[in-house]
């Protein structure tokens, strides 16, 4: 039997899905779990008490467990340069297992990466393909493990159910690099590979923007039948992948009917055109797309104040991009948080055009954002240590401006920073914002 080590359970159920996949096959795998965090961090562990799994929590040095394993399933958040990983016999991940499975040999794989817009683009394409009567499954960085999809495909095979027409995989730079390592410096066969945008990100994990982007471009090689990239990336892409220029298309083109819309609609339209769908069918499919949680998600409108949850805006440029989409409405932004070693350059539009600014606390807020705001004489309230305090401040300010202008106001959570000092992750941050909105609505209806 193969000895499998799940290295890192993570915050978004990826590790749980990996554990479930291997632990449910006791005739094939012997399973261990190693995580630096204590057991109390993982509420779901009791679900595995009747399975033959060894857990090593608060495991500060996983060296012996790594040496024990035939294969290490590495959580993407664990650095690939972790010294102990040099002792591994083989390192893999969920995407490598899925894309090399016999069950996907007749399924078209679509991959989506990019600093900004990858989740919403993957979601829009998946939505459209379903509307076009295609059997499609989405997974990856969007919060659905490829092991969950692989389990479904195995169940389909047992029941004689056809495999999906398409699998859409959203891939972070870490997932791309992990898959590249798992497949021995290769990538799986891809029908359409998409690169949505380039900005600095994860500089708390990468030495430079260039190192970060080099992981991104590992996704693109002769394994890709079709390639779609944002036109701003064209020069960079040609420098790093000159052999792929002939199979590469850019978006948006001047003829793109979604050129004035959000990036996901621009990209999804061009992607579906490359996949040979008709214009009228594409328009009908995208017309019904309503977006995904935490990404410019309209939560509610109460007394002419709109509430938007954009918690997934974890870099400054993403916050400014979202604010451009709601301007010229008067908006009251909740921003700030933890530092990914990014500059404040990208936050300029969001801060300059905001009617009011409310700050969430964090080392990015304290060390970079507040000095930037004060340098440019932008007023702000906070920083606050809880979402409720920040929300109450922004909401009060929005009501005051509305009373004076009698115009619709927008309260938007678009932090432009990560969340880990005050929240579990960006989804927890967004959920707490939505809970604040729902509390107002409940009070109004009493």
Where are the regions that the model predicts?
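Flexible active-site lid/hinge loop adjacent to a nucleotide/diphosphate
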Residues: 159-255, 421-426
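Short, basic phosphate-binding NTP loop
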Residues: 1-25, 29-111, 287, 295-297, ...
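Residue-level signal for inorganic ion chemistry
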Residues: 22, 72, 112, 141, ...
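Residues in the short beta-alpha loop(s) of Rossmann-like NAD(P)-binding domains
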Residues: 10, 37-39, 142, 232-233, ...
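Nucleotide phosphate-binding/pyrophosphate-handling subdomain across enzymes
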Residues: 3, 21, 257-354
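Walker A (P-loop) phosphate-binding motif
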Residues: 98-142
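Glycine/aspartate-rich loop-and-adjacent alpha/beta segment that forms the canonical ThDP
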Residues: 415-446
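C-terminal helical cap/extension that packs against the catalytic core
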Residues: 32, 36-39, 45-47, 345-409
């Amino acid at each position: 039997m193969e000895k499998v080590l799940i290295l890192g359970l993570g915050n978004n159920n990826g590790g749980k899905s990996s554990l479930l996949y291997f632990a449910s096959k006791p005739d094939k795998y012997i399973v261990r779990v190693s995580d630096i965090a204590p057991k109390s961090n993982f509420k779901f562990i009791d679900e595995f008490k009747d399975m033959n799994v060894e857990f090593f929590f608060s495991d500060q040095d996983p060296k012996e467990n790594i040496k024990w394993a035939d294969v290490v399933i590495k959580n993407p958040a664990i650095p690939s340069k972790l010294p102990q990983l040099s002792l591994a016999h083989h390192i893999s991940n969920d995407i490598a297992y899925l894309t090399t499975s016999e069950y996907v040999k007749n399924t078209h794989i679509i991959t989506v990466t990019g600093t900004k817009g990858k989740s919403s683009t993957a979601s829009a394409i998946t939505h459209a393909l379903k509307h076009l009567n295609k059997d499609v499954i989405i997974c990856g960085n969007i919060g659905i493990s490829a092991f969950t999809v692989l389990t479904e495909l195995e169940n389909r095979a047992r029941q004689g159910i056809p495999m999906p027409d398409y699998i859409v995989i959203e891939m972070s730079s870490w997932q791309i690099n992990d898959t590249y390592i798992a497949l021995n410096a290769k990538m799986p066969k891809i029908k359409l590979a998409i690169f949505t945008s380039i900005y600095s990100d994860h500089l708390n994990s990468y030495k430079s923007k260039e190192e970060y982007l080099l992981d991104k471009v590992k996704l693109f090689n002769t394994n890709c039948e079709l390639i779609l990239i944002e036109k701003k990336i064209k020069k960079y892409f040609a420098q790093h992948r000159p052999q792929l220029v002939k199979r590469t298309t850019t978006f948006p083109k001047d003829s793109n009917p979604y050129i004035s819309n959000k990036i996901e609609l621009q990209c999804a339209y061009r992607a579906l055109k490359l996949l040979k769908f008709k214009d009228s069918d594409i328009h009908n499919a995208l017309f019904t797309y309503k977006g995904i949680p935490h990404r410019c998600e309209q939560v509610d409108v109460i007394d002419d104040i709109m509430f938007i949850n954009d918690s997934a805006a974890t870099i400054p440029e993403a916050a400014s991009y979202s604010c451009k989409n709601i301007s010229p409405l008067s908006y009251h932004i909740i921003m700030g948080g933890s530092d990914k070693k990014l500059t404040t350059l990208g936050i300029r539009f969001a801060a300059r055009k905001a009617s009011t600014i409310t700050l969430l606390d964090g080392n990015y807020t304290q060390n970079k954002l507040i000095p930037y705001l004060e340098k440019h004489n932008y007023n702000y309230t906070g920083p606050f240590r809880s979402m409720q305090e920040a929300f109450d401040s922004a909401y009060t300010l929005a009501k005051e401006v509305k009373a004076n202008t009698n115009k619709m106001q927008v309260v938007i959570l678009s932090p432009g920073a990560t969340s880990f000092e005050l929240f579990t992750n960006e989804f927890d941050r967004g959920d707490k914002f939505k809970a604040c909105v729902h509390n107002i609505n409940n009070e109004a209806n009493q």
